[in-house]
Amino acid sequence: HTGYIFVNMKNSIFFCLRDSSGTIWEDYLQHPFVQSVGNGSLSENSFKYYLIQDYLFLIQFSRAYALAAYKSETLEDMRSAVAAMSNIIDFEIQLHIKYCSSWGLTLDDLSGKCEDIATTAYTRFVIECGHRGDLLDLMTALAPCVVGYAEIGRKLAESPTLDQKLNPFKSWIEMYSGEEYQKIAASAIHQLQTLFEKRGGPNRYNSLSSIFNQATRLEIEFWEMAWKQQE
């Protein structure tokens, strides 16, 4: 069971931001796209569109971590950013390409497509947060994706409606509910907390909350983008 990783973090800045977001966070976690992945009813067309856009998304997120390295003020933060970028480029994207091939998508299918407007809007918002702000702003913008997928994966894996044998998205759920990804999310929460303690404070909370909420809304739009392919 992977939930233990988050037990001692409930008072951290991440959970304060999440819990003060109103219905936005639950709308993200409970979007029809997510629910349809959980019960196996999502159309193949919708999921393939998501996979293509997620490939393009990952490329831009690796750039966000390159920016994080530039914005870092300590070697520890710089190493963390470089490790995250390397993980996306050398590991996560390669895994994604391999997973996409199981859905009949080639590398040409992935790289030959244009970014959806939702993909561009989300990724450029994150990068812009890093350009105009500091590392805390950038990590806050990244948090809904990194940590949100861990929470979604965990909830779907624990759902009584998950058909372990017949759900075609079972391996996707296992990837984000697995201990390895859960630890990545926990590390992101810890880093955000460390940055907040160094650079945060009450005067920054409202601006961080605004960044967090907007990034979460853009996550919802990313789901919605793929969900519309059902129609």
Enumerate the language-model features and the residues they cover.
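Short, positively charged and aromatic/hydrophobic N-terminal segments
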Residues: Y4-N8
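Short alpha-helical hairpin
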Residues: R18-S43, F61, I189-K198
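Long amphipathic all-alpha helical oligomerization modules
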Residues: G178-F212
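Secondary-structure edge/capping motif, primarily at the C-terminal ends of alpha-helices
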Residues: A68-S72, G130-G133, L156-P160, L195, ...
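His/Met- and acidic-residue-enriched segments that coordinate or traffic transition-metal cofactors
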Residues: K10-N11, V34
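Alpha-helical bundle segments that constitute or directly flank the non-heme di-iron/ferroxidase center
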Residues: G22-D27, S41-K71, F91, T140-A150, ...
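Active-site-proximal alpha-helical scaffolds that flank and shape metal-associated catalytic sites
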Residues: M78-K183, N213, R217
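Acidic, carboxylate-rich catalytic segments that either coordinate divalent cations
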Residues: N206-E231
